Each structure stands twice: as C-alpha cells, then as structure tokens.
C-alpha cells in the first residue's frame, strides 16, 4: 500500500491558499452582484488564528443598509440624513451591509488551517494568521497596482 502521509503545512502554503480563496471569493461576489461597486474587502479571522472568511462591502449594499437603518432611528438633524448615516455606517461592523459567508471559497484554506492547528505550526492566539493575512493582502494589492499600471 502506498504511503499517503501528507507533507506538513507551511506558512507559504497557507498564504497561497489564502490568496486563492480570497480571489475566488471576490470573483463569486462580483458574479452574484455584477452591477455593484466594491469599496472594501477584508479577511475575518478567528481570534485563535485557525479560520478565515472574507467580507466585501459595496456602495449599493451600504445604500440599502443605510436606508433601512434611517427608517429605524430617531430623526437625524442634518441637511442630508441619509448621507450622514452612510458616512457613519461605511466602516461599521462587517455584519452590517457587507457580503459575507456562507461561501465555500475559503474551505480550502480553512482545511489547511485545521491541519496547521493539528500539526502545531504556530501557537493559538499568537497572531500568526493575522500576519499571514496582511502578507497576502499586500501581495494582492501589489498585483492589483501592477495590473492597473499596465492598462
């Protein structure tokens, strides 16, 4: 019988899977909401550091959420109450008007993170996943900048 032992998980493998998952998730959101304008993308991680998901904010979702909230709050005394509320809610918690899970895009990286936990690649709560996410987002941002420069 062939040896089926898997290679240990590496930080590089996690970064690669993070990027693939993030790009897959962004494509899925764009396909589901083709006429919407994204203004933010974030990676939400567990405090323990062994799971990750994405969230996307769009101008249109912010508008819908703001309008919905405007109908629920006391009158806002500004020249443009909706604009004031949009400004307040733009960077509110990602549960408010952002597109989030459930989505299977992050399943591959979460399987790797589960293995990383089992293999004790890093300590729980040590910030390693946070650093890997920052590294991945920077690489994605650099790639986006390069793409924009060639257009």
What are these regions (language model features)?
Residues 2-38, 42:
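Short N-terminal edge-element motif at the start of the domain
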Residues 8, 80-151:
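Low-complexity intrinsically disordered segments
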Residues 16, 20-21, 35, 46, ...:
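Generic serine detector
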Residues 27, 58, 143-147:
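Soluble, non-membrane globular domain cores that form compact, hydrophobic packing
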């Amino acid at each position: 019988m062939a040896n089926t032992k898997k290679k240990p998980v590496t930080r590089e493998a996690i970064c690669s899977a993070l990027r693939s998952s993030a790009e897959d998730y962004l494509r899925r959101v764009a396909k589901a909401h083709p006429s919407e304008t994204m203004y933010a993308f974030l990676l939400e991680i567990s405090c323990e550091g062994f799971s990750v998901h994405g969230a996307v904010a769009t101008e249109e979702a912010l508008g819908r959420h703001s309008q919905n909230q405007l109908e629920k709050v006391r009158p806002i005394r500004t020249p443009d109450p909706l604009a004031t509320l949009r400004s307040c809610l733009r960077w509110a918690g990602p549960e408010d008007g952002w597109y989030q899970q459930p989505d299977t895009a992050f399943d591959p990286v979460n399987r790797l993170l589960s293995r990383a936990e089992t293999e004790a690649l890093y300590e729980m709560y040590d910030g390693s996943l946070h650093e890997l996410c920052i590294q991945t987002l920077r690489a994605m941002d650099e790639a986006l900048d390069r793409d924009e420069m060639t257009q």
